[in-house]
Curated annotation (Swiss-Prot):
Gene3D superfamilies: 6.10.250.590. Belongs to the glucagon family. It is found in: Secreted. The gene is gcg. GO terms for molecular function: glucagon receptor binding; hormone activity. It comes from Lampetra fluviatilis. Keywords: Hormone, Secreted. GO terms for cellular component: extracellular space. GO terms for biological process: adenylate cyclase-modulating G protein-coupled receptor signaling pathway; negative regulation of apoptotic process; positive regulation of insulin secretion involved in cellular response to glucose stimulus; protein kinase A signaling. Its main location: secreted. It holds the Pfam family Hormone_2. Transmembrane segments: none annotated. The lineage of its organism: Eukaryota, Metazoa, Chordata, Craniata, Vertebrata. This is Glucagon.
Amino acid sequence: HSQGSFTSDYSKYLDSKQAKDFVIWLMNT
């Protein structure tokens, strides 16, 4: 099940990256 846990970790990473990019975008506008 390592593939499944990797996928969920990766999606969590993408979510946090998107959230960070969103905060930066908010601060820049």
